Amino acid sequence: MSFVSTPPLSRTPAEAEPAKPIKNDPFYPDVSLEHARDTIRFDGTITDARLRHELLAAIAEVNDELRSARAAWRDAGITCLADVPADQLDGESVRLQHYRRAVYCLAKATLIERYRDYDTTGDGARRADELEPQGDELRRDARWAISDIIGRPRMTVELI
């Protein structure tokens, strides 16, 4: 039996510098690719371009789900999510922490689902099957984070 190991992909010269944060709607925080990468534990196999693409899609989805809550907060004179009354942890509003969690979880879930086409060998198919529940759990975590932002109770329903 032989063992073959490949080193992690090194960043291209264009990616050698930290990627610029994603500019978000002024109500919501900008999203740092470096923070996202560190938080959701992706290695160098996910390029900045691919990560940016999935984070943009996740931001759009979360912002859309928060649209009515944002309108209500703006009607109340609140100009950004950080100003919505909330507990502070580590010097930051928990709503901001929940926002990032929702975005990061959705992005990671989508990237995990895309790994199915990355390696279609028998081992790759088994690995993809192992990751499927993780993707579902990440989507659940994102929904819970959104519920926490707007103060809606979390709910899990199973069909009997």
Question: Predicted segments — roles?
Answer:
Residues E61-S68, D90, A109-D117:
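Amphipathic alpha-helical interaction surfaces
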Residues R95-I160:
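Short loop/turn elements at secondary-structure junctions
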